């Protein structure tokens, strides 16, 4: 039997937030980090620092449980507060979810927090057992939000040569050819010029095909700077005719590396340049931070990889040239706290808010 309680973190715990998050059952996620909390706080979401603790049954033994998870809070007119755990809360597996949901409800009701619904997005692999556990809870499946609910994850444990050999032949050959032909990848400073060049690349190639709605430049600027200032983010370019032609912003968080943002100009001359950008970032993070995995952050679901009509088909082709290991997570679920208010939210208030938000701000509500 799992026994889990929820409380707000102390000021001392918030001060060391990243240390706690990286020790979470899932190894931590950059979208649960202190840096991300600062960014979202400037764009209309209040970070709420939640600590789950208790005891759980694992392998027939009672073990202590602790999970430090960010809930982002938004006030919804007439309904109250919505909580969104972006890529959280952190758990070992789906079996811990029912106790965690009970902890949410107790915290919210006992402290009269006015939260009518909690949106969760835990990194639990979507296997049959997880789906069965979730089906037995109060959770309501909703639309996916983050791009890496389906994603390609490369294992980076081993030597550089061993990891290179683990790539598919297409990815490996692209890296080697670009290297052989003198393609140069540079890690660059986060100057305004470089960040604007990166933003332009993100807004150039294939974005219409993958239905991305870019946030304003200022959001990415603040995001990139926040993670760089924490020693967790870096920007890479390759150049063509003296101008950036491929860009990637990557993040190290705990033992995880993540390809967070990328862009490139179309019809480039150098074969394999985008592969070499990724390979350079991966090997740098291996050497400097000892990462054990690298998340390419977004593909079609595993069953849809060969579907040419899928909006992420092209991205999937590129990313699976590094690893065929595509992971499907369970996705996004709502936990209704107030049944009446949630029915109103689900019946049309959410869709209306999202539509009005995008019309006014020209970027995603979440």
Label the predicted regions.
Residues 86, 119-121, 260, 297:
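A cross-family glycoside hydrolase active-site/sugar-binding cleft signature
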């Amino acid at each position: 039997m799992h026994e889990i309680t929820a409380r707000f973190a102390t000021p001392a715990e918030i001060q060391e937030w990243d240390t706690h998050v990286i020790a979470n059952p899932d190894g931590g996620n950059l979208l649960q980090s202190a840096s991300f909390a600062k960014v979202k706080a400037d764009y209309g979401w209040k970070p709420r620092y939640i600590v789950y603790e208790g005891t759980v049954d694992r392998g027939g033994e009672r073990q202590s449980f602790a999970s430090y998870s960010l809930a982002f809070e938004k006030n919804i007119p007439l309904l109250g507060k919505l909580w969104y755990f972006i890529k959280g809360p952190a758990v070992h597996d789906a079996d811990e979810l029912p106790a965690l949901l009970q902890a949410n409800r107790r915290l919210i009701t006992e402290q009269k927090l006015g939260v009518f619904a909690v949106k969760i997005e835990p990194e639990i692999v979507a296997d049959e057992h997880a789906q069965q556990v979730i089906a037995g809870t109060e959770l309501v499946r909703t639309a996916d939000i983050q791009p890496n609910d389906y994603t390609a994850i490369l294992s980076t444990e081993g030597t550089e040569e061993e990891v290179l050999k683990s790539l598919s032949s297409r990815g490996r050959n692209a890296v080697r050819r670009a290297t052989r032909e003198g393609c140069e990848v540079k890690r660059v400073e986060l100057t305004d010029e470089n960040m604007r060049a990166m933003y332009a690349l993100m807004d150039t190639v294939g974005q219409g095909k993958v239905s991305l709605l870019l946030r304003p430049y200022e959001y990415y600027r603040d995001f990139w700077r926040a993670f760089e200032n924490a020693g967790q983010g870096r920007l890479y370019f390759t150049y063509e005719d003296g101008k950036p032609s491929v860009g990637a912003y990557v993040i190290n968080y705990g033992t995880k590396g993540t390809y967070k943002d990328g862009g490139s100009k179309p019809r480039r001359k150098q074969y394999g340049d985008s592969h070499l950008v990724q390979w350079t970032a991966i090997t740098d993070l291996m050497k400097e931070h000892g990462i054990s995995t690298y998340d390419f952050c977004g593909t079609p679901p595993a069953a849809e990889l060969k579907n040419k009509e899928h909006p992420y088909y092209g991205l999937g082709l590129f990313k699976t040239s590094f690893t065929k290991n595509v992971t499907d997570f369970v996705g996004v679920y709502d936990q209704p706290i107030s049944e009446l208010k949630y029915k109103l939210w689900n019946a049309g208030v959410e869709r209306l808010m999202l539509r009005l938000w995008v019309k006014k701000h020209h970027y995603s509500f979440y």
